[in-house]
């Protein structure tokens, strides 16, 4: 809900967007272009949120990191000149019950490759304010790293 107070220029520079699937209790990493199209443009109202495919030049892509990717690998990334892995876009979903840390590989629309580390996942809940019960969306805390030669570039 913090998003609604952002300036239009700030909204347009968001490179990562998340979608929560209440049925499967999972958080999906999605392309910001896809989310803008689904939420703002009313063009794809009949499309299923998690099965739509975009092929646009500034399309952020994700893939789950291998199971053997560790915190040590993540910490070394900013000291490396390159992060060589074969990137294959795939659905990146994190169950809200997942053990943390967990990792997602990311490739920005400009081809920069890096890693997102999920540090914690807060499940959906409710809170009572003034005697009224309100839903609280799930949340994640995360950080990102890119190879050293990309660390000074703008991620967009």
List PLM regions with ranges.
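Surface-exposed, beta-sheet-biased, low-hydrophobicity segments with strongly acidic/polar composition
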Residues: 1-156
